[in-house]
Amino acid sequence: IDLNVYNEALSLSHSIGSDLSVLQQVKMRGRNKTHERGITFDGNRLILSQMGVRDVFRAQSESKNRGHVGLVLVRDISASMANDERYIHAIKSDLALSMAAESLSKMHVSNIVFPFKESEFEIIKTFDQSVEESLSKFTLGCKGYYTPTGSALMAAVDLLLDSQFDRKIIFLITDGYPNKSEFTIVEVMEKAKCNGIEIVGVGIKTDEIIGFETDTFVTVDDTSLLSIEVSKLVHQILS
């Protein structure tokens, strides 16, 4: 990989790490008070039962604790990414996000690119591999003339379904225009939602990602703006 690209991505990773760390905040059942475990009556709700309130049980307490997060970065390397050097901004974003996540003790990152040679996608880094040992697979090349976004996203969903993380998130890095694919974006979104998996987009030099609502992605016109857009992703979309 180009040394300048790597160094810029490494520098960017330092500026986005603190924002990504917020994603480790996971809603978990509180375990502080023994008497709150299981089903118990709520005194305040019991009083209201005379007025017709039927739910008189105490809700399980919830708190935000640091949990293990599985993050899959799915990057578009189709031919259209060569326009306006989008692929360079995409790989810098991919690497920066990967290295930032890797620096956090409870975040685990895997990377997928699509399309890849004769396949619709390729897993270039698994959760148990480091960025450094997978670096040779982070290619700048544009590998295909079609964009099987749905299939690549479904692979990411399946990867997370096979994991035991407390929170599961997918970042799609793309110029936003899927085509030939076994699965539609809608099908993937529905499966992800049913299984508690969050999917957000990082649009590279585009104000539209087909299949994504406007409040589920950010636009990166230049990687110098990546830290600003990651902050939006974390605090406005994934909060």
Q: Across the structure, where does each feature detected by a protein language model lie?
A:
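Acidic/polar low-complexity segments with low predicted structural confidence
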Residues: 1-71
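Von Willebrand factor
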Residues: 62-167, 169-173, 201-209
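Short, solvent-exposed loop/turn segments at secondary-structure junctions
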Residues: 81, 179-180
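Short secondary-structure boundary/capping segments
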Residues: 88-90, 125-129, 185-189, 213-218
